[in-house]
């Protein structure tokens, strides 16, 4: 395995990856650790987080921490970010990767299903970014990367996710302008369709 990035690019940096127990988050955490970062994994399932942390330690010999957290829960997010800062003192970056959705035409999405996807893909990312900023980055600076989706022309079959990701794109632009004076960069990345474990729940052929 050889990265396209410079060796030790993130040496001495502490980076949080939400949704770090599987899929894109897991791969992102491995890449960041391989480039020298100390990664902090967040997710809802402790067994998955522990497995990825163990993989990273074995592959890189570097420290990997993990915390269970439902990013849709404001109090839990606040407390988890506080616990992270207590352990690592400074957070240099946040990858807002956690998300989830289910395939459905717009007409068949219930209010509960709609609100669940919005809370996961928009509200959760906002809460994480806000708390990381307010609890440390407003003083130390840093970088926030929000993982979105290729929703620019609409997302047929995924209207709830497209709406949430479009909201996250606008939030990204607003936060970038408001937090630039604190030395915080905020960007969004739309990786497109990735054949990760997240697609295991989708119907065949989608």
Go through each PLM region and give its residues.
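Catalytic loop of short-chain dehydrogenase/reductase
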Residues: 145-167, 172-181, 193-194
């Amino acid at each position: 395995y050889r990265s396209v990035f410079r060796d030790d690019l993130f040496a001495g940096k502490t980076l949080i990856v939400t949704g770090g127990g599987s899929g894109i988050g897991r791969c992102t955490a491995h890449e960041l650790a391989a480039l020298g970062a100390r990664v902090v994994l967040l997710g809802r399932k402790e067994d998955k987080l522990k497995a990825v942390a163990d993989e990273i330690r074995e592959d890189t010999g570097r420290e990997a921490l993990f915390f269970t957290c439902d990013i849709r829960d404001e109090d839990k997010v606040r407390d988890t970010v506080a616990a992270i800062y207590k352990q690592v003192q400074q957070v240099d970056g946040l990858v807002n990767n956690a998300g989830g959705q289910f395939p459905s035409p717009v007409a068949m999405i219930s209010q509960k299903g709609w609100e669940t996807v919005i809370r996961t893909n928009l509200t959760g990312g906002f809460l994480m970014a806000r708390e990381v900023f307010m609890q440390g980055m407003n003083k130390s600076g840093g970088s926030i990367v929000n993982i979105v989706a290729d929703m620019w022309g609409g997302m047929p079959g995924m209207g709830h996710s497209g709406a949430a990701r479009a909201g996250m794109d606008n939030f990204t632009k607003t936060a970038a302008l408001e937090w630039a004076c604190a030395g915080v960069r905020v960007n969004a990345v739309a990786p497109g369709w990735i054949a990760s474990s997240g697609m295991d729940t989708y119907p065949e052929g989608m």
